[in-house]
Regions:
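Long, low-complexity, acidic Ser/Pro- and Gly-enriched intrinsically disordered regions
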Residues: 123, 150-152, 180
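Solvent-exposed loop/turn segments connecting transmembrane beta-strands
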Residues: 24-41, 63-69, 171-173
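Outer-membrane beta-barrel "beta-signal"
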Residues: 171-185
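C-terminal beta-signal and terminal closure region of outer-membrane beta-barrel proteins
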Residues: 160-174
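Solvent-exposed loop segments that connect transmembrane elements
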Residues: 149-164
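Gram-negative (and chloroplast) outer-membrane scaffold detector with strong preference
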Residues: 40-137, 141, 182-183
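Cleavable N-terminal export/targeting peptides
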Residues: 1-26
Length: 185
């Protein structure tokens, strides 16, 4: 995975001269939210690509599931209707792979791995100091498979975890809204 991310990063840096941008344009942006971090590269005025990584920990406390932890790494593409470095509506696609661990009330853990694709309709505000804020929401689809389980009792909580994973596989509106603060350079 490290080699894949390094390759993507090098491609982003080395393709800059192919798109005819002036050296004064802001080509890169670092973005962060509470649980994810990204580096993006502007291909031109309206298109950007990048990669991101993060970890989201959620206290669930329902259906015998105490908490869930999701670690992920992925790539993203964004299209801004006006421009990336101005106030504009945009469409973002995010494709990630990751691991999810669920802990049940009896202390059992269930580990899943898989991938997720999100499509986000967003609006971004770009400020004169090169800071930006992006807020959006949209559908998500994921495919998960159980990797392992560590049972502490025979209460059958694994079925509750499977039901939750199935419920989260397709969400017409993602349960996690898209929010990022960024700096362009």
């Amino acid at each position: 995975m490290k080699n894949l991310l390094t390759t993507i990063f090098l491609i982003l840096i080395l393709t800059s001269p192919l798109f005819g941008q002036s050296s004064e344009d802001k080509k890169f942006a670092v973005r962060t939210s509470i649980f994810a971090h990204a580096l993006t590269y502007n291909l031109d005025k309206q298109n950007g690509v990048g990669f991101y990584f993060g970890q989201l920990s959620t206290d669930i406390n329902e259906d015998n599931i105490e908490k869930g932890v999701n670690s992920f790494v992925g790539v993203n593409y964004g299209y801004a209707f006006d421009c990336i470095n101005c106030d504009s509506f945009s469409i973002l696609t995010l494709l990630s792979t990751g691991n999810a661990t669920f802990t049940t009330d009896d202390g059992s853990t269930y580990n899943y791995s898989g991938w997720v694709i999100n499509v986000v309709g967003a609006y971004g505000w770009y400020f004169e100091n090169d800071l930006s804020v992006i807020l959006g929401i949209g559908p998500s689809y994921g495919s998960w498979s159980k990797e392992s389980e560590n049972l502490k009792s025979d209460k059958g909580y694994g079925k509750d975890v499977e039901d939750r994973v199935k419920k989260l596989s397709f969400q017409p509106i993602s349960s996690t809204p898209f929010f990022a603060i960024g700096y362009s350079f």
